[in-house]
Design a protein with these regions (language model features):
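Short, well-ordered alpha-helical packing segments
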Residues: 52, 69, 76-79, 92, ...
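Short, charged cytosolic
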Residues: 81-100, 197-211
């Protein structure tokens, strides 16, 4: 007699998916159209059909240990062609959000960052810290900032800013490492490769794919998202590189402020512009396609908003310094600092954490040979081309 398996759906998990963009999960009837049209679906154990089945049955443990969830880059080809409107891309996005929250350390921050009611309390933390540093530096005499030319080192010495920036980031990376180590240990739910590759053997190939955004540029219905994400990606890391170079220029060459046409300043300005433009492209795309292609969750918008605010206030701060308007320049700089610390200190808990989790998952998949594209997709493209 065949052995029976009792499946017990996790209703709370299903409700989480529905509240976080995956409200169409129950519309799926496993036709596998999503697996056929997905350009990233491997040859065997096709994705994302099996993930949609597991999600509709509330199989939480199966999904949080499934690296295939991270194959999806949100291009929404699957949602576009789904005959039932199940929007697999949104369901997978909700699953990834749950994974990040599950492995977050401390866990309560992973939950808080996704709820609008906690936005103000989370903002107040960096606000109070920076305000106290500023108050201590100025001995409570803020009126002195209205005198003389704009000089941010007088407002808040760079050594203090960098000490908290570096110290905070070390703590953030430590918390991130705890979550990622648990995530890595938990990855399974795929058939291991007979000749499993080494971690280092595939790590640099994975980084190369990320730098070129190769997997973002494979879908046929969502090209504008590729350019928006690419601008944000390089703008973000360009800004981080600028910050590091600026610290070196300050402490090694006492360069303060950095001249407007200096390469470091040019890199920073171009990065800021790339971030602003990228966020606008992504936001416009989301507004245009929200009904037919995908949902827009608070978790999505909070990241787009704060990346935009960090870049916009940074560029505005520089402009106000050049125009030598102390009151506006110092206040904008203060707000800019609050936004920066909010974005970076809460990175392991927001959607920004996907860059860490996706990278590890892609490495794991490559180690086990799960990065190969399905030949059926290439055949479908060929047929579709001639049908049209």
């Amino acid at each position: 007699m065949n052995e029976r398996t009792l499946i017990q759906p996790d209703v709370e998990f299903i409700n989480y998916l529905k509240k976080n963009g995956g409200d169409t999960v129950k519309e799926c009837y496993q036709c596998a159209t999503c697996s056929v049209v997905c350009s990233l679906s491997p040859e065997h154990e096709a994705f994302p059909r099996k993930e949609m089945i597991a999600a509709s049955w509330g199989q939480k443990e199966t999904l949080i240990s499934d690296p295939d969830v991270w194959l999806c880059h949100g291009c929404t080809d699957c949602s576009t062609y789904c005959p039932r409107g199940a929007k697999p891309a949104d369901v997978l996005g909700a699953i990834r959000s749950y994974v990040i929250e599950s492995f977050a350390f401390p866990k309560f921050l992973g939950s808080a960052i996704k709820k609008p009611k906690y936005l103000i309390p989370l903002l107040i933390v960096p606000f109070i810290i920076i305000f106290l540093l500023l108050y201590n530096n100025l001995d409570g005499n803020f009126s002195q900032l209205n005198e003389g030319t704009v000089k941010f080192s007088r407002f808040l010495p760079h050594i203090i800013v960098e000490a908290f920036f570096i110290g905070g980031n070390i703590l953030v990376f430590a918390f991130t490492a705890i979550g990622l180590s648990q995530f890595w240990k938990n990855l399974n739910n795929i058939t291991p490769a007979a000749n499993k590759k080494s971690f280092l053997g595939v790590f640099f190939a994975t980084i190369s794919e990320i730098l070129t955004h190769k997997n973002f540029n494979t879908c046929s219905t969502n090209s504008s998202r590729f350019w928006g994400h690419l601008l944000i990606f390089y703008g973000f890391f360009g800004a981080m590189l600028t910050a590091g170079l600026a610290v070196g220029a300050l402490f090694l060459y006492d360069m303060n402020p950095i001249p407007f046409f200096h390469p470091i300043k040019i890199l920073g300005n171009l990065s800021g512009i790339a971030l602003v433009v990228g966020c606008v492209v992504v936001a416009v795309h989301r507004f245009k396609t929200k009904d037919e292609k995908g949902s827009n969750t608070y978790n999505d918008w909070i990241l787009i908003l704060f990346v935009f605010l960090v870049a916009a206030t940074g560029l505005l701060t520089e402009t106000l310094r050049l125009f030598d308007t102390p009151f506006l320049a110092y206040n904008t700089y203060f707000v800019h600092m609050v936004f920066i610390f909010f974005l970076l200190w809460y990175a392991p808990y927001s959607k920004l954490a996907h860059m860490f989790y996706r990278t590890l998952a892609m490495v794991y998949l490559k180690m086990n040979g799960r990065d190969k594209k399905a030949a059926i997709f290439l055949n479908m493209l060929f047929i579709t081309f001639f049908i049209r």
